[in-house]
């Protein structure tokens, strides 16, 4: 009878009351239980007061109660009916899974975005290529036009100026012919003093030509003596006339490593050169500075002005027709 009464009394007590009584019989405080179970004191207090914290899942609460029962030596089977009331199992709220259609829609949207990105990239690349091709084509047309113009100008100059060098040589030969025949009257010895006076003057003015005439004509020793005395004085004068002039400090020197169209104009507007230069060709131009240059292929020419190389790298990098002006720089006094 006493056993049944005790069992009925235990069933009447709640889970929290039974755990609190068992704890008090063991002489433990709520703080000690909380430290052993690694719980907060407030959680132990809620368990003993049969409270279910709203922020604590029922699964965790049932686990805490079982740990508390093992600590105070209370059989878990006796607490099961009370656990169902104090901490009933609640279905966990599970977020609804995204439907397959939503994932498919998002994937489709990402595909459209990627396609649009590639389309924009292709358009940019295409526009860049078209712009480069137009510039390249325009440069080639400009070079061809300038080459045709220069060829036509060179042909016109050749047709109109072929007689110029011939006239110069004829004039030179005409100037030398009288000079060679002039000393003949001055050779006789028995001429009067009046006729002998102009002979040195004629010989002095035409001393550059007397020497050849004396070398070619075999005359008598008496008649050749006056001319022979004048010959040594004529040699230095003729040698000085043949000596090369000093180099122009404003000379423009160009060496070509490939075929290149070129046009050079000086300060007066005179075209010093206009046409095509072949590989391994050289040009040495002199005019009035500054010079204006148009070069179809800057990479094919090396320019020196006033003894210094001219930098054409900016035109070579952009592959453009070079248009530049070379200004005259003051030369140091010698």
Curated annotation (Swiss-Prot):
**TM regions (residue ranges):** 112-132
Superkingdom classification of source: Bacteria
**Where does the UniProt annotation place the signal sequence?**
none
Q: Which residues form the HTH cro/C1-type domain?
A: 19-71
Specify one Pfam family: RodZ_C
Instruction: Report any one BP term from Gene Ontology.
Output: regulation of cell shape
Any idea which residues the entry calls the DNA-binding region? 30-49
Q: Disordered: where is this region?
A: 154-241
Which GO cellular component term is one of those annotated? plasma membrane
Please give the SUPFAM superfamilies that the UniProt record associates with this protein: lambda repressor-like DNA-binding domains
User: What keywords is this UniProt entry annotated with?
Assistant: Cell inner membrane, Cell membrane, Cell shape, DNA-binding, Membrane, Signal-anchor, Transmembrane, Transmembrane helix
Chain intervals with Low complexity compositional bias:
176-211, 219-241
Q: Where in the cell is it found?
A: Cell inner membrane
Membrane topology for this entry? Answer: Single-pass type II membrane protein
| Periplasmic topological domain | 133-334
Q: Recall the GO molecular function terms of this protein's record.
A: DNA binding
Query: According to its UniProt record, where is this protein mainly located?
Result: membrane
User: Which ranges does the record list as Cytoplasmic topological domains?
Assistant: 1-111
Domain remarks:
The helix-turn-helix (HTH) motif in the cytoplasmic domain of the N-terminus is involved in the formation of spirals to maintain the rigid rod shape. As this protein is anchored in the cytoplasmic membrane, the HTH motif may contribute to protein-protein interactions to form the RodZ helix, which is localized beneath the cytoplasmic membrane. The C-terminal domain may be critical for determination of the rod shape by probably interacting with enzymes required for synthesis of the peptidoglycan layer, including PBPs in the periplasm.
Q: Which family does it belong to?
A: Belongs to the RodZ family.
Entry function: Cytoskeletal protein that is involved in cell-shape control through regulation of the length of the long axis.
Q: What is this protein called?
A: Cytoskeleton protein RodZ
Please tell me the species this chain comes from. Salmonella heidelberg (strain SL476)
Q: What is the lineage of its organism?
A: Bacteria, Pseudomonadati, Pseudomonadota, Gammaproteobacteria, Enterobacterales
Designated gene of the protein:
rodZ
């Amino acid at each position: 009878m006493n056993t049944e009464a005790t069992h009925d009394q235990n069933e009447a007590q709640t889970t929290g009351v039974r755990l609190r009584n068992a704890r008090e019989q063991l002489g433990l405080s709520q703080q000690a239980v909380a430290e052993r179970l690694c719980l907060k004191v407030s959680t132990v207090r809620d368990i003993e007061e049969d409270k279910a914290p709203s922020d604590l899942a029922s699964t965790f609460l049932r686990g805490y109660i079982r740990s508390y029962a093992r600590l105070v030596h209370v059989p878990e089977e006796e607490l099961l009916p009370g656990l169902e009331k104090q901490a009933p199992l609640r279905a966990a709220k599970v977020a609804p899974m995204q439907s397959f259609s939503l994932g498919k829609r998002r994937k489709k949207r990402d595909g459209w975005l990627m396609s649009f990105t590639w389309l924009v990239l292709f358009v940019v690349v295409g526009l860049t290529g078209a712009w480069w091709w137009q510039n390249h084509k325009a440069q080639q047309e400009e070079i061809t036009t300038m080459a045709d113009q220069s060829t036509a100008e060179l042909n016109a100059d050749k047709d109109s100026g072929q007689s110029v060098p011939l006239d110069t040589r004829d004039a030179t030969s005409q100037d030398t012919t009288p000079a060679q025949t002039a000393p003949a009257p001055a050779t006789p010895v028995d001429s009067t003093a009046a006729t002998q006076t102009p002979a040195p003057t004629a010989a002095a003015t035409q001393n550059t030509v007397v020497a050849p005439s004396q070398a070619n004509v075999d005359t008598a020793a008496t008649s050749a003596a006056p001319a022979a005395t004048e010959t040594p004085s004529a040699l230095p004068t003729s040698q000085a006339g043949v000596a090369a002039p000093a180099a122009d400090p404003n000379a423009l020197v160009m060496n070509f490593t490939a075929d290149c169209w070129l046009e050079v104009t000086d300060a007066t507007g005179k075209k010093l050169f206009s046409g095509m230069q072949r590989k391994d060709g050289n040009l040495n131009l002199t005019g009035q500075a500054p010079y204006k240059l148009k070069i179809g292929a800057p990479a094919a020419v090396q320019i020196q002005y006033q003894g210094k190389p001219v930098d054409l790298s900016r035109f070579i990098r952009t592959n453009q027709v070079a248009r530049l002006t070379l200004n005259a720089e003051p030369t140091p006094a010698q």
